[in-house]
Amino acid sequence: MLNTILTGEPSDRPPLLIVHGLFGSARNWGVIARRIGTDRQVISVDMRNHGDSHWTESHDYFGMAEDLAEVLEHHGRADVLGHSMGGKASMVLALTRPDLVRRLIVADIAPVGYGHDQLDNIRKMKQVDLEKIASRAEATEMMGDLEAATAAFFLQSLDLQEKRWKLNLDVLERDMETILGFPEVEGRFDGPALFLSGAKSSYVTPAHHAAVEALFPEAVMEEIAGAGHWLHAEKPREVEAAVRGFIEG
């Protein structure tokens, strides 16, 4: 089963499952998990090939959805919040196992393919000589021209003591086209769904609304003012309020 971080105690309210994005980990949503975990249990997962979860030979959305289903079969039906890659995995979970999902929140992603890729970032991480580095500052220098915030985000997945990335970079690189795409899935999710996007992000636009509504007919679209793709890091209070309002509604 996926590595999980549990925040808060089980209560009469449904648990909230939080699913991070590409190159992330369960800890990325820690601030929001702790705040929402005051009155319900929050289950944050490390996705396959990330963090302290198992490595696999494939990184596709049906496999990721099966991983999430295994977690919820253990913890019970839940509200599910997924960001970016985790949002796509959460959508596939809701479409294939609607019995496990009470309410769905998708953060800044749509059920469509995207043209950009993250291969250059993988190459930068692979430039780090793991045998030689003694500090994160040295790793940052080896990665070359990266924004400070991006480098800091990647370094959360660097285990200096074990001299390894907690990311299966080879598989993520090989399956990047699959990660950027969205699989053909039969059926639809008729439960409540909130598609939360950053107003400054280009990941979800009005052109994507038809694709969302075809699979999630009850979807509500909401923007977080002033936020980009990393809306939970940029506007945590606003994201928390939107999530809380939706799951308590």
Predicted region positions:
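Active-site glycine-rich loops that stabilize anionic/oxyanionic intermediates
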Residues: 21-24, 84
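Flexible "cap/lid" loop of the alpha/beta hydrolase fold
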Residues: 91-96, 100-134
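Gly/Ala-rich beta-loop-alpha elbow adjacent to hydrolase catalytic centers
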Residues: 82, 86, 90
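Conserved alpha/beta-hydrolase catalytic His-Asp/Glu region
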Residues: 131-185
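Conserved serine/cysteine hydrolase catalytic core
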Residues: 162-215, 220-223
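Catalytic histidine-centered segment of alpha/beta-hydrolase-like enzymes
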Residues: 227-236, 240
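Active-site loop/oxyanion-hole signature of alpha/beta-hydrolase fold enzymes
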Residues: 5, 11, 30-38, 43-81, ...
